[in-house]
Amino acid sequence: KFALSWMKDLINHAKKRGLYVQFSFEPRITSVEQTVATVHDILKTYPNIDALELITEETGGWGAGCTRAETEATLNNFFDKSVATDSAVNAPIKEKQSDLNALYMQIGIISKAIKQLNMDKTMHPEFKLGIYCSITPYTKGAYRLARLALPETKICLMSSHGSEGTAQALPSVVLTSQDRKMTEIYSWIEFDGLMYLYQNSISGNEKMMKWLSDSSDNTVSSILFNHWRSAENRTSARFATEATLDATVSAERFYRAYANRLSITDKKRFIEAMQLVNRADVFATTNLGNIGFCWMGAWGNGGSYTWMSKDNIDYARTIYLNAGNLLKDILKQTEKGTEANHYLSFICNRVLCSVLYLDAFREAVNIQGVIGKNQTAESQAKVKQICDKALLIFDQYMAKHAEMLEDRGCEGTLVSVWNSPIRGLKIYRAQFGGVPMDVPSSLDAVDAPPLPIVY
């Protein structure tokens, strides 16, 4: 009840200030009738929303398996023959694969539900169909399917993880000027799979805006930018704001203007540092999949410590460390008490936190060589030693992060890291090291390494 009341107040607050409010939910695989009933419940609860998006659940390769026959049967069941047999819709179908049948089925359910809802002319909000799919061949087919099934309905498209992936995927999915007019693009200011690392999404959003501005008709319905926090994202969010007003704004020009406003004198090294963070962001999104995922469920069985690549961790860590050292030198040149000093101090803090997070992960993945079905006393002791050291580094991460709590989002990050990756590592320590979950980080006080950046 509290959550519903809070959301109502938030929506009413936004409406009073003239904002357009769009609500989104995942019907998932249920009946058309149940989906329509859920829509009515949502509109009864939140009558002031302007639009309601019915979006597919995320498709990324981990879903249920399916056969060609099953997917073709789904197409024939939900869509007209001309749609079901469209070459672009059928292009990603294989004899055996994961996810695609579920994705197409959800589009079928949503499209039928929207058609039924649109028959009632008294319905107030605009209905939109959302697609969240990070497998580009699937995205192409799904987007084409949605456009053919609902040509007068806006499609909300989340085509990848991170802004760089979005910029790469969009040109092969959204093909025509009419497609652009009927598409709401989801991009990213911040990716939830890297929540515990400092991020910079500017290069990807720069490329996306260039793609839009270079097209013969640069009209697009709208662009939605995913993000969860404010303090960590002030620079990336500012770029997204300026780029949507002027798509010709380059990243370098933006950085120079940003540094000017803050009176940062060493603009060259500031730009270099921010580009390094951007590079680390792109690399981690691609090669350290969900290493900082803020969803607790990802860590329910322990998490990614058993398969994450140490080489990739080292590579990302080096980039962050180089960025941190540049920022540290710039910070020394700024006067204490100035906005530039506060801004750079915060970024230095979060870059250092990123290094510490990767240090903890780098230590924790050493369990890969000692875990197994038949743990010996020796291997259990080794697992415990590895986990204890990693947990102490996580303690360093939390302590450093807590030095600069700019807003509730910063506080929430601490709660999240404790309940997700730290808890996940304790699950492995209990499972393979025989240590109860409620035991502190270390009983033996293994020395944690010194902090890599001092400022």
Specify the residue positions occupied by each region the protein language model found.
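Substrate-binding cleft of carbohydrate-active enzyme catalytic domains
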Residues: K1-D120
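Substrate-binding groove of N-acetylhexosamine-processing glycoside hydrolases
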Residues: G18, K44, T56-W62, D86-Y455
